């Protein structure tokens, strides 16, 4: 996967009318299938290859995670782990990019399956320890 630099000089809030394609959010459903190379490959082919829907936009969800002490989230697909965690040994916040390996597996497969990939990144919430509800 190539790194794309974000331009801070273009202050436009639109893409100036350029159509970039079709896509889907990778939130939740890929968390459920990304453990399996077979399911990951099949999903990438069905959604992003020319043999399937030929989508090209992937919306990657950076999960906020949930307080490990809470047990209110029952659906395994919606438990998207966050990258940021507090390391008690170093007393610092650190990133663990492998925490969300299921979604990353599907993202890579989808990226490789399409000819003109666009990746958008979003988050539905901050890390749990940055909220009052926790």
Regions found by a protein language model. Give the residues of each.
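N-terminal catalytic cores of secreted or lumenal carbohydrate-active enzymes
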Residues: 2-134
